[in-house]
């Protein structure tokens, strides 16, 4: 009798122990059934800010466009003899920050006493862009003393005797730009054997992007009337479309990769294009820009640039002054002298 009672008690206890589990399971089921109605997903607000920022900007940065022009399409690497592109890419970083409204000349009436490239620049928007190199430059400039355009390009290139400022050098710029282009689906990763070593290469996967870049450059340097086509990578709603293209042509010239954009032209037209980019670099490396109509090439360029500049407030011209300062630095490169 007592054994039976004992067994019944055990069974009852077992039943009681199972009930909370059943209630827990049923509660979980009911919770899951209502999950679709009012669920919440955690997110980082910075991701939304960077997404909104990217929608307003071109698909490729100025640095990426210059690198693309320098890359051999099938081999996927830059010329081993090109020692100009590294310095030019650092200048492109400053210009890209200026085009995005983040870096401008310090608002000081006395700045005009100094050469354009020696004027001090300041960071006015420290929000990150989602572009690795731009974000690294933003953090560096934000936490540093105020310096000139020339100083920043020199420091980011590692061209300084000051051991205290060696840390300002941006390292592996070309490789990181190539990785970004791989992520964007424009390049692909490969490895090729050079003598005894395997070297990463990045052949072009989407040639249409590079073709559109070359077309813009050729139009600015050879066309009687400049027309910049609308494309997914360079949409019509972008600000400073024409000025960006001029900066691209001049930067490519300074980086010694412009010839790759002109490979479909005959010898005479190539020589004219190089003469034209020399003129553009001279005209746009001063502030205000020297806008005058050419009799043979780009007759409407002054009008296009004037329209772009007239659409911004006077204070915003301080950003464009940075672009002119970088181009002035380029005029002093050994490769162009």
Swiss-Prot record:
GO terms assigned for molecular function: phosphatidylinositol-4-phosphate binding
Residues found modified as Phosphoserine: 15
Pfam families for the chain: GPP34
Record's keyword annotation contains Membrane: yes
Compositionally biased residues, Basic and acidic residues: 16-43
Residues covered by region (Disordered): 1-43
Residues that bind a 1,2-diacyl-sn-glycero-3-phospho-(1D-myo-inositol 4-phosphate): 81, 90, 171, 174
This protein's GO CC annotations: cytosol; Golgi apparatus; Golgi cisterna; Golgi cisterna membrane; Golgi membrane; nucleus; trans-Golgi network
Entry's localization field: Golgi apparatus, Golgi stack membrane
Membrane topology label: Peripheral membrane protein
GO biological process: endoplasmic reticulum unfolded protein response; Golgi organization; Golgi to plasma membrane protein transport; Golgi vesicle budding; protein localization to Golgi apparatus; retrograde vesicle-mediated transport, Golgi to endoplasmic reticulum
Membrane recorded as keyword: yes
Listed Basic residues bias regions: 1-10
Keywords: Golgi apparatus, Lipid-binding, Membrane, Phosphoprotein
Role this protein plays: Phosphatidylinositol-4-phosphate-binding protein that links Golgi membranes to the cytoskeleton and may participate in the tensile force required for vesicle budding from the Golgi. Thereby, may play a role in Golgi membrane trafficking and could indirectly give its flattened shape to the Golgi apparatus. May also bind to the coatomer to regulate Golgi membrane trafficking. May play a role in anterograde transport from the Golgi to the plasma membrane and regulate secretion.
Family the entry assigns: Belongs to the GOLPH3/VPS74 family.
Quaternary context: Homotetramer.
Official protein name in the record: Vacuolar protein sorting-associated protein 74
Naturally occurring in which organism (per UniProt): Schizosaccharomyces pombe (strain 972 / ATCC 24843) (Fission yeast)
């Amino acid at each position: 009798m007592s054994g039976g009672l004992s067994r019944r008690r055990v069974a009852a206890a077992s039943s009681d122990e199972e009930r909370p589990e059943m209630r827990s399971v049923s509660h979980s089921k009911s919770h899951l059934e209502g999950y679709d109605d009012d669920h919440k997903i955690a997110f980082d607000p910075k991701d939304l800010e960077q997404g909104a920022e990217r929608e307003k900007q071109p698909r490729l940065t100025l640095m990426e466009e210059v690198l693309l022009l320098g890359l051999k399409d099938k081999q996927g690497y830059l010329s081993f003899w090109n020692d100009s592109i590294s310095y030019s890419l650092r200048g492109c970083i400053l210009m890209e920050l200026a085009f995005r409204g983040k870096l401008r000349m310090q608002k000081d009436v006395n700045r005009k006493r100094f050469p354009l490239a020696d004027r001090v620049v300041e960071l006015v928007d420290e929000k990150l862009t989602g572009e690795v190199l731009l974000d690294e430059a933003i953090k560096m400039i934000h936490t540093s003393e105020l310096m000139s355009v020339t100083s920043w390009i020199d420091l980011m290139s590692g061209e300084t005797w000051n051991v205290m400022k060696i840390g300002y050098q941006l390292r592996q710029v070309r490789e990181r730009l190539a990785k970004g282009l791989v992520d964007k689906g424009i390049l692909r990763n490969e490895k090729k054997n050079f003598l005894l070593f395997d070297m990463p290469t990045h052949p072009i996967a989407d040639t249409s992007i590079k073709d559109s870049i070359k077309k813009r450059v050729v139009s600015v340097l050879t066309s009687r009337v400049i027309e910049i086509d609308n494309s997914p990578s360079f949409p019509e709603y972008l600000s400073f479309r024409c000025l960006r293209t001029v900066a691209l042509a001049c930067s490519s010239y300074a980086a010694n990769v412009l010839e790759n954009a002109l490979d479909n032209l005959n010898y005479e037209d190539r020589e004219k294009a190089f003469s034209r980019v020399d003129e553009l670099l001279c005209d746009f490396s001063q502030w205000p820009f020297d806008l005058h109509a050419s009799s043979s090439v780009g007759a409407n360029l002054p009008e296009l640039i004037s329209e772009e500049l007239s659409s911004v407030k006077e204070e915003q011209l301080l950003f464009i002054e940075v672009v002119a300062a970088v181009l002035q630095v380029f005029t002093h490169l050994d490769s162009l002298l």
